[in-house]
Amino acid sequence: MAMQYDVKSYHSTVSGVAVGYRTRLKGILISPSTAVTYNTSFCNNVNKSGTYAIAGTTTCTVTIANHGLANGDRVYLDFTSGGSAQDEAYTVANVTTNTFTVTTASLTETGNVTMYPDILVEIDCSNGTAFYTLIPGEGILAKQGIYVGIPNVAITTTLFYG
């Protein structure tokens, strides 16, 4: 296989769409600034919107019509309004056609949420040292682009794609 010359990069300090078209994720550089455990998600850029409610417990009920999930699935949730729920990857439980639950911090709030159900890569880090993750072969296919989910402003990422 010949060397690929059209690899590009995208640097981000906040969550958002990094690439808005079909591409392959080739590698990821993560630079945490503190030694705290973080989870950064790189998702296929397909989402569904809905609402959430947390009633003073650690159970967050998410309502999204025909979400298509099953118990045990991992999703990235971007809490777009309503309070202080943490944007990050969650494991889905108690699935019905239009609702599911995830475990969050104990809060009392409601609001809107955007779900990214197709996580391409999740990377955990627990120290303040930058590191690179090489994606082997041709990379991971992101059919609709790449959404980067950064749970904390103490992390920056650079992704390589093409």
Predicted regions and their residues:
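Short, surface-exposed beta-strand/strand-loop-strand elements in extracellular ectodomains
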Residues: 35-46, 117-123, 157-162
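Short proline/glycine- and polar residue-rich coil/turn motifs
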Residues: 94-95, 124-131
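Noncatalytic modules at the cell exterior or secretory-pathway interfaces
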Residues: 26-28, 139-153
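Small/polar beta-strand repeat architecture
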Residues: 46-118
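Exposed aromatic-hydrophobic patches
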Residues: 63, 102, 131-139
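Local beta-strand/beta-hairpin segments that build beta-sheet-rich folds
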Residues: 6, 13-20, 45-46, 117-125
